[in-house]
Amino acid sequence: MIFLRLTTLVLLFAMVVVSNRAQPHGEGKQEPSAEVRSQLFKQVLADFRDLRECIEQEEGGARAAQENMSVEALDVNHDGVAEYEVQMSGGCACGMVNCSIYIYRKTAQGFESILDDASGLGVEVLKTSSNGYSDLLVEARDTAATRAETTYKFDGKQYREAKATIVHVETGERKPASRRLQFARGTSSTTVTGRVSIALPDTFLLGARAGQVMTVKLSAPRKSVRFLVMSPTTRNLVADNAREWTGTLPETGDYYIIVDADERNSTYSMTISIK
């Protein structure tokens, strides 16, 4: 899931309410039977090999993981038949706070996953819907100062990430977790402006090919404003505190350009070009 990668990038760089909610986590949901819990646990392990292999190495193994698994029934397609929110716990499925979240629906063959790339504190079912299924909101801890809110919409087969936002916990200020840069037709550069802090950076995505040359020029009234360029495999390409950088791109894919500052909000202007 792209937001997970972006969260990792922002944390690396730091080291170098919500409308339309209908059903908060845990409210209006039913506890499934022991048989359903067992079937869902087996299905999760069958679907996610890395998780299964990790759990097998943990103290207590699969039995402890199943006991600690959270399963709640909900009806996201309003047909009177339950779907199930499954949240694993422990080091194999969780970071410091956020844990992997899955949603399964019943089929003639058993259970199939319709959401398998979410991580957070739980699922909220929204009033809005897509293709007959309620939209979902997953809230996650991002940093000590911010939380992440990711909206998922059903595309007819699976829930897909539709929007990701970071929110400052104290001020309520919010911004997109990332924005995609696009050049105007016939041009090879663009200029963006914004206001950032260490808690609320700006993250841009720019698709490029290996061998192209990227140039980034940053202008800001405060020296604390800085930028970082990360390759598609999250390799840092820029020296600390650089205000200008030119480099030949090593990979084909989406490059991440992150701008942040210190605790104070700071304005900036940045020009990016690719040749």
Place the predicted regions along the sequence by residue.
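Extracellular beta-rich ligand/substrate-recognition surface
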Residues: 58-66, 191-200, 237-238
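Short consensus segments that form the blades of beta-propeller domains
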Residues: 61-62, 90-96, 141-143, 217-218
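Acidic/hydrophobic-patterned starts of short beta strands in beta-sheet-rich repeat architectures
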Residues: 77-89, 130-140
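Non-catalytic extracellular/lumenal accessory regions of secreted precursors
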Residues: 173-205, 211, 275
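Acidic, Ser/Thr/Pro-rich low-complexity intrinsically disordered segments
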Residues: 196-260
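Short beta-strand-plus-loop segments that form exposed binding edges in beta-rich domains
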Residues: 140-143, 258-264
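Acidic, small-residue rich beta-repeat scaffolds with periodic aromatic anchors
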Residues: 5-8, 12, 21-53, 125-177, ...
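Edge beta-strands of jelly-roll/beta-sandwich modules across compartments, strongly enriched
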Residues: 202, 263-275
